[in-house]
Amino acid sequence: MIKQNKKGRFDGALNSLRTLRFRDVLKWKLLHPYSPAKSHKCLVVKDEHEKLIAAQDYLCWLGHASFLFQLGGKRILIDPVFGNIPFYKRNIPAPYTPAMLPNIDFLLLSHTHYDHFDAPSLRQISKYTKQALLPLQMGCLLKRTVKSNLHCTELN
């Protein structure tokens, strides 16, 4: 269970965070050399754009942690990443561009790690939605990054 402490920060039930020193990282890199995967089998992505505008509920995986789903007539886009980001190259292109997506009722961002909070993707998608659901204290960062009039609702 994660709760907000008196200083406004979030702490997990187990205090698993610790400070890493440079020598710890160096030791890890030297003792665990990088070995790329031997083969990648890519998923086949079918273009089913017509289903994205249907009235029925659906869930569509857009790659990595990006999802678009419709529930009760509301479309919600989670952690959109449409291109390559540092240290994470897409094995297959995104199945849809932001312009291909139907109107988005809510943009939901889970946290600010670069593979979930991609500034170029957020700038693109901000043209197609006006509402963002965010963790506490993330609204200012999103508005600075996107430079649009997104209405930000911060949730605990």
Model regions: which residues?
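A short helix->loop->beta-strand "cap" motif at the edges of active sites that frequently abuts
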Residues: 74, 127-131, 147-149
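Metallo-beta-lactamase
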Residues: 1-86, 96-100, 134-156
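Short, well-ordered, mixed-charge alpha-helical segments that flank or form enzyme active sites
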Residues: 85, 116-117, 141-143
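A generic "binding-loop/recognition-motif" signal
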Residues: 65, 113, 138
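Active-site metal-binding motif and surrounding structural segment of the metallo-beta-lactamase
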Residues: 88-134
